[in-house]
Design a protein with these regions (language model features):
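Catalytic cores and adjacent flexible loops of soluble metabolic enzymes
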Residues: 1-343
Length: 343
């Protein structure tokens, strides 16, 4: 799939998710874009919302988080603290362009999408918590841009509906990311085999949005067919933000990108034909040799013929055919047996 100038058929698309790791500082956001590029990310992703496009400013129990990393926090207050302000977007997109890194965002409501459209992003992402909103999904599909959907809390029925909407809107560029909506995610809760299931069941491009510690999961995901990897990125571990607990710093992210590139390189093309290196090593395969001196007219037997390394003699498949045949010439111990040596 083509996302901007990037082709996911050729390389795994690595996304640095900035999210709240700007810690309320535009300067930190801009520095993070430059650092993400240096760390090897193909794209920087931000989030486009206001607390009012996310939730209601209510103190009722429904709007208070229970458990987890943000226990007892009010939803409105959380989103007010974590947002990437609208007024930053122009500088963020401009900086990304200047640094040569792709930039796109997750809008969370119609007004966010309308605002984001002025920057003509290369793609959109739909968070799993918004993926059940069919009207919003259709608005995104109508944009005819590559769209990434996190599947975290989304049901199979909802995922089928998303596919149906994109088909109706004639937008074929859909990517599902396996995602576990726990922050952070325990490695045993990842269910990475779901990547394979998403590909087989929905026939879409697949990847991983990862909230676990470290980067074991992204590397494994590549081996399972992921063509997109999204991971939260932060400048350094001293940053205090809503997402810092499950984010990679510069050194960790760079190490992850290196590991992902090694993993995709190790996968190869899947063909079973021997490559040039393997063909060279065929010299050490077994073949038939004289294990004793053999006189002309003497019969070949288990006593004077052996299948050994290297491979300059007859293929071992001729062993049974050779037994009982007569030597056409004197053969010395250690000679490779050839087609004309028996009759």
């Amino acid at each position: 799939m083509q996302i901007g100038n990037f082709n996911t058929d050729k390389k795994v698309f690595v996304i640095a998710e900035l999210s709240a790791n700007h810690a309320g500082s535009l300067e930190m956001a801009l520095q993070s874009i430059k650092a993400a590029k240096e760390a090897g990310a193909d794209a920087i992703k931000i989030q486009t919302y206001t607390p009012d496009s996310m939730t209601l400013n209510s103190n009722k129990e429904d709007f208070i988080i229970k458990g987890g990393l943000w226990d007892k926090r009010k939803l409105y207050e959380l989103y007010e603290s974590a947002k990437t302000p609208y007024e930053w977007h122009s500088q963020i997109f401009e900086t990304a362009q200047n640094e040569g890194i792709l930039c796109f965002s997750s809008p969370f409501a119609k007004e966010d999408l309308e605002f984001l459209k002025r920057f003509d992003p290369i793609a959109y992402k739909i968070a799993s918590f918004e993926a059940n909103d069919e009207n919003f999904v259709r608005l995104i599909a109508k944009e005819k841009k590559p769209t990434i959907v996190s599947t975290g809390i989304t049901t199979e029925e909802e995922l089928f509906k998303i596919c149906e909407i994109f088909k109706e809107e004639k937008n074929p560029d859909l990517i599902f990311l396996k995602c576990t909506s726990a922050y952070p995610t325990a490695i045993e809760d990842m269910n990475l085999k779901g990547i394979v299931s998403l590909k087989e069941k929905f026939n879409v491009e697949v990847g991983l949005s990862d909230h676990s510690f470290g980067f074991l999961a992204p590397v494994m995901a590549v081996a399972l067919g992921a063509r997109v990897i999204e991971k939260h990125f932060m400048l350094d571990k001293n940053i205090e933000s809503e997402d810092s607990k499950f984010s990679l710093d510069f050194d960790e992210f760079k190490a992850m990108v290196d590991a992902v590139r090694q993993a995709e390189s190790a996968l190869g093309d899947g063909k079973l034909d021997l490559d040039e290196k393997a063909l060279k090593n065929r010299v050490f395969a077994r073949s038939l040799y004289a294990s004793k001196d053999i006189k002309k007219g003497e019969m070949f037997s288990e006593e004077n013929v052996k299948s050994v390394r290297p491979s300059f003699g007859l293929h071992p498949k001729f062993y049974q055919e050779l037994l009982g045949k007569k030597a056409t010439k004197d053969i010395e111990f250690g000679d490779a047996l050839k087609q004309g040596d028996f009759t």
